[in-house]
Amino acid sequence: MIKLSVSIDVSNLKGAEDFYVGALGCKKVRDQGTNMAVLCVEKSDIYLQKKEPGTKPLTSNNVARDYQRHWTPIHLDFLCDNVNEIVARILKLGGSHEGGERGDWGTIAYCTDPFGNGFCIINE
């Protein structure tokens, strides 16, 4: 059996915990050292990892971490009953709402956390 976990780099561990617990309903599982916290949503763990801006995520590349809005081909989708309620909490806790769509299939909101990481809130 394989279990999925997700790692998210952040510049402020306490702020990230507050955001993911308060806005998205994640549960705190434990601290893992001084620079990592483990959260849980349903059966998936989210590892929040404090990484300083400007540090290198890869030894083989000149890319440096920054926490401005950035795009990645992989993102998280959080499924919920009430998209508008979750978006309001995201905004209150420092995240952003970048638009969305609505149709017969449901509703989606495009959002970011305070560290530039994009994700979607979906009601199907």
At which residue positions do the language-model features occur?
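Conserved Rossmann-like nucleotide-cofactor binding loop
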Residues: S44, D81, N117
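Short hydrophobic beta-strand segments that form the core of ligand-binding sensory/regulatory domains
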Residues: C120
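Vicinal oxygen chelate
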Residues: M1-S5, K27-F78, V87-T112, N123-E124
